[in-house]
UniProtKB/Swiss-Prot annotation:
Its EC number is 1.14.14.-. This is Cytochrome P450 52A3-A. Induction: By alkanes. Together with an NADPH cytochrome P450 the enzyme system catalyzes the terminal hydroxylation as the first step in the assimilation of alkanes and fatty acids. The keyword Cell wall biogenesis/degradation does not apply. Belongs to the cytochrome P450 family. It is found in: Membrane. PANTHER family: P450, PUTATIVE (EUROFUNG)-RELATED. The gene is CYP52A3-A. GO terms for cellular component: membrane.
Amino acid sequence: MAIEQIIEEVLPYLTKWYTILFGAAVTYFLSIALRNKFYEYKLKCENPVYFEDAGLFGIPALIDIIKVRKAGQLADYTDTTFDKYPNLSSYMTVAGVLKIVFTVDPENIKAVLATQFNDFALGARHAHFDPLLGDGIFTLDGEGWKLSRAMLRPQFAREQIAHVKALEPHVQILAKQIKLNKGKTFDLQELFFRFTVDTATEFLFGESVHSLYDEKLGIPAPNDIPGRENFAEAFNTSQHYLATRTYSQIFYWLTNPKEFRDCNAKVHKLAQYFVNTALNATEKEVEEKSKGGYVFLYELVKQTRDPKVLQDQLLNIMVAGRDTTAGLLSFAMFELARNPKIWNKLREEVEVNFGLGDEARVDEISFETLKKCEYLKAVLNETLRMYPSVPINFRTATRDTTLPRGGGKDGNSPIFVPKGSSVVYSVYKTHRLKQFYGEDAYEFRPERWFEPSTRKLGWAYLPFNGGPRICLGQQFALTEASYVIARLAQMFEHLESKDETYPPNKCIHLTMNHNEGVFISAK
């Protein structure tokens, strides 16, 4: 067949739109690949090992992630993926055409969060979270984030977080709920989530939703505020959907069911009620409210009168202030119920400092005196090590950049990270690395925090993130958790775990908690 005849037969197909589109796509991706290779060579970088189970466009891996997350095993799944590469701390995978570097190396995490902070951003997080949280400190990048942080930082000054006395009325109701189940098996986590939504709404709005109140206590929940009665449940459901949107990455828009939209509306309704109340208050009423005790919203109103800014920032802080503390308390009590020796040792420390039972000196528990409880601090450190509030996080490269380690077969070369690529980092796994925590890294042992090896961990211990975006409310959460555990130690001598699964299945929404609840008995 003559060459002219071949050209004559093939030419019509070459001019078809789909052929042109295919050729353009191939050319585009080939040019990107060649460009990346050039920069890898220029910057003396090497690719990390490719995750062999990712499959075509990462779709099989994404399906696996959805399955294990539903089963409460996502954190442990990401942990075990590194078992395939025992000498490496990073690997590469893909989601569609998106390149993803997965790392547990403290040096890489430090680069992403601190030393190369301006090379990375939240990426699509704003789109993922926007339906519930809007434009707040956890969803914004750049100038918007800087303005949010400047606005919120004063609200977490020492005098605010030191005011533990406001917690006591809520602790009393929590204790009554526990005593209702004396000698019985009950879900303590469910009570902690109700407790922290009560304390968080009082701190933020100036009035608690009192979700711990119920008919069993003879204290019916008040129903005088629109949306109060179903706020906590709606907030939980909305966060579940936000997490699904996050793990769906570029397919987040597929998660937008009616239930999600309805729950968002319920949450917004309550927040808007409090915002409007604050905005309609006179200057004198605002000052009077502030004198009665610190109220986050009324302090914020002194800085801005924009109702959307107020609503969005309140809900952003609600996520952190409520869920991280509830998760920390739940995991701490889960381990304490499993380890009676640790519980007894903790109670001995509380007895020395504040007394127990009928001899409890509750008035002596303060921000300052809680600092004396070194073993309590070690228990919380160990809880946050094994169960960090945000076990897995990610950032997106805003420009072509590098990570210091993880490339090549030995994992010691820099990694080239093209603009638009994601870096996923697992603090959950980093906190279990034996080179930092020893052979018993998977065991709950508070005593490790009195050993020299844990005094120079640096970026290998990161319970509250790090760098410019380090958690503003970390001391607030630690103070609240310390107070609650100290009070429970005063009131309950014996704890017994009723959970048979260990390690526990973990539910990861925006933060982490027990997938099935924390079932114990207490007396």
